[in-house]
Structures are given as structure tokens and as C-alpha cells.
Amino acid sequence: MRQNLLETYSRQLKVAEAYVAKNFEGKTMSSNTALTTAVLLDNTNRWITESLNSEIGATTRDSMGAWKKFCLNLTNIAVPSLIANDLVIVHPMTSYSGSVAYLEYVSLTNKGDVKKGDVFNSVWGHGEMNEARQNFTSQVIVETVGDDGKLTLADSLVTGGLSYRDEETREYKTATYKVNGEYTDDASKVVAGAKVAYMTEQFQMNHIPSKEIPAIGPRMKHIPLVAEPRRIAVRYDQITAFQAKTDYGFSLDKQIAEQACGELAYEIDTEIVAMLKDGAKAGTSEDEFKALTWSKTLPVGVSKFEHYNGFLEVVETAKAIIYNRTKKFHPNYMVVASDILPVLRFVNGFTAVKNVKMNGPYKVGELDGMNVYVSPIMESGEFFLGLNGNDMMSSAGVYAPYMAIVPTQLLGTPDGGMAQGFSTWYAKALLNKNLLVRGSIVA
């Protein structure tokens, strides 16, 4: 089906590729963007054909074919121009509802501090690699001693001595088990509050029943996606449209339609940025935000160039935070407030876009290969970093369009007024806030 759609709309896709290359400094459309555009062209084509046919009610336009072509051209240009394509994964929908399915791998058994259901590996990142996890498949059991100095043996086969790590010296020592559930060291002091690893000669793989061997397994989860409509109406006077055509040589109805579609595109990009911004705020701890708060006030004896270039340290710290959370990802884009641009101009590795094409949020340049965008929804000094990979599992969010730009019939009233509606249908969802982190530049 996908290949058929790409072939069916190959001519329109070539036009879209040429438009993107011309207006976005030679940028090429990704295969996912091309497929998304083809699916939306097909959805829009079928919608217009069905909704404006003779059974439902004939359109008032003289040339239905020309108007349909115009609407498809709007889709062809609007979809590839969205910066949402660069900030989140775009998943076209062939129905107004769908879901994202993914797997995560969890522990199926208890072994020391590793409990049944603990996540080992997920599409969103790896689980915590602590001392207990390191020894999950070994003969060693790692378990936390309670405040009372007692612990419950994880397996009935485990008996005998205990190897524990001294919290002060960080050395491993040997303790002796007592019948009352306590362990004492060589000085007969109760071992408490330390991470311990205890083993026994009886704890061998070939001595354990198969059901007791440490095991992991998959768990499938779903994220629902339901497309919701966004609508806008355009109204104008019939005589005004006539004067525009005869006196100035342009079609007012198409001009207004393009403006309406531009407004829809502006809102889509802004809504996606707002979703990511809120996700970054929710996913960033106080300590992380404090580490990513940078003052542009010049220290005594330091030039503006040297100090502003130090903002790179904050960017690298943000990258490290996302990597430490997931153990597998780095951010590849940054969204900033407009007043951060003067700082970026001083940062080594920043390359500005020469011919900026903007409709609300826009791409301003690159910083060491990381795309940088400006959005009017960002408050003064705000910025956040995020990741948009090649699939939903490596992206912070998803934009799932169902209908790109679909029109209603053009209606006329007795007083000469003309009215028409335009709508877009799409779903969106925040997938992984661990792929987002926010910071701030203060005075």
C-alpha cells in the first residue's frame, strides 16, 4: 500500500521536494515525510470526493476538479513545511483512531533487590544498572539490609556466610549469620544499613529448579491515538472578490484559503512545541534545572565572547542528563526563546540559517549538528533539548495527522456574503519525557 501511494502521488511529491529544497536551504524530504504527505494526499482526495459528490450535495463551485487540485496542492506544501516533522516522529493515520504498541522487558523473578516486574530494557531506555542488576544472572545475591540489621533470604537454598561492603571503607568484608536473622562482623557488631552480597556454595545454577532461575520476559503496552479536528472559517464579500480579480488580478478565495491553512500550520507547530515544553518541564528535576540555569551577566575580567561561549557547557550538561536517564540516547534538537539568539551568535559551533522561512516557529540554525529552533511560545530565557529519532521509540513525541487540509462547500448568502470552512484532523502524544530536558538563561 505504501509503495502504491508513493507511486500514485509521485508527481505531487516531486513538487513538494522542490519546494522544500528551495525554501529550506537545500533540505531534502525524508522518506517518512514523503510517505506522510502521500497518505494525507490520499486521505484528502478521498474525503473531498466523497463529501462533495452529488449524493451529499453538489458544490457551488463551477469547477470542482480545479478546486480539488488546489486543496491537494495546499496539503502538498503545508505538510513538508511543518517543523513538527523535525521535533517529533510523524505517523500518518488512515483512520481517525489508532495506537502505538511497544515492548518492554522485565524481570519475571525475584532475586535480592531485583523484584518481579522491574524494567530491564525498554524502547524508552534501559533500567537502572545497580549492583543487584549486575549480579542478576550470577551466583551472587545483592540485597539491602533493613534498618534493624535483618534481612529475609531470597532463596531457601541460600545459607552460610555473608559478603558485604563497608559503607565507610568501601571494602568487602565477611559476616556470620546468626539464628535470629542478624549478621555480625568479625567484631560481633550487627551489620546494618549496607549494600550486601551474600553467596553460598549451594547457590549453583545446576542446583536450582528451573522455575527459580533468574528470568526476563516481554510486556506489551499501548499508547492510544485519537485524531481531533481543528476548524477555521473564512468569510468575504462577493463584490470584494470580484474587484480583487478584475482590478488586481488575484483570486481572493484562494488567497484567504492559503491564509487559513497558514494559520492551521502555525497552530500545529505551536501546539507541538507546547506539548514538548510541558513534557520537558515535567521531566526535569530541580537539581537538573539548577544545573542548566546559566547567567549571561559578565564576570569581572571576562570578555563577552569568552563568557557567552561558556554556554556550551550547559548544552553538553543537558546532553549528559538525557544520556544518563536513558543509557542510549542523546538529544538532536534545541528549542529556544528569541532572546537567546544573541547568546548563540557567540557560541563556537553555531551556524545560522541564511534564508529563513518562517511561519511562527522556525529553524534558526545548527549547533554542533543539533538543529536549533525559535518558537514564540517560549518565555524569555527558556530553552529545552529533545530527541527525534527514526521511529516512535526514539522520539519524545508523536504527531499523527489524519486529514491535512480539508474544505467544506463554499456557501453564498442572499446579501452577497461568501463563507467556507477548513479543518485539519490530527492526534498528538508525549511519548517519553526522559528525552526532554529544560533550562534557562537569566540576567
In which residue ranges do the predicted regions lie?
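Acidic/polar, low-complexity extended loops/arms that serve as protein-protein interfaces
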Residues: T75-P80, S95-F136, L162-T270
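Beta-sheet entry/capping signal
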Residues: M64-K68, S97-Y102, R231-A233, K328-M334, ...
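Short alpha-helical segments and helix-capping/turn motifs at coil-helix boundaries
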Residues: P80-V90, N180-T184, I216-M220, T317-I321, ...
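Extended, solvent-exposed, turn-rich assembly/linker loops in the middle of proteins
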Residues: E286-K357
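Sequence/fold signature of self-assembling virion shell proteins
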Residues: G125, Q202, N206, A215-E258, ...
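Extended assembly-interface regions of large multimeric machines
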Residues: M1-I141, G149
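Alpha-helical scaffold segments that mediate packing/assembly in large oligomeric complexes
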Residues: Y236-Q238, S251-T317
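Surface-exposed beta-strand/loop patches in extracellular or lumenal glycoproteins
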Residues: G146-G160
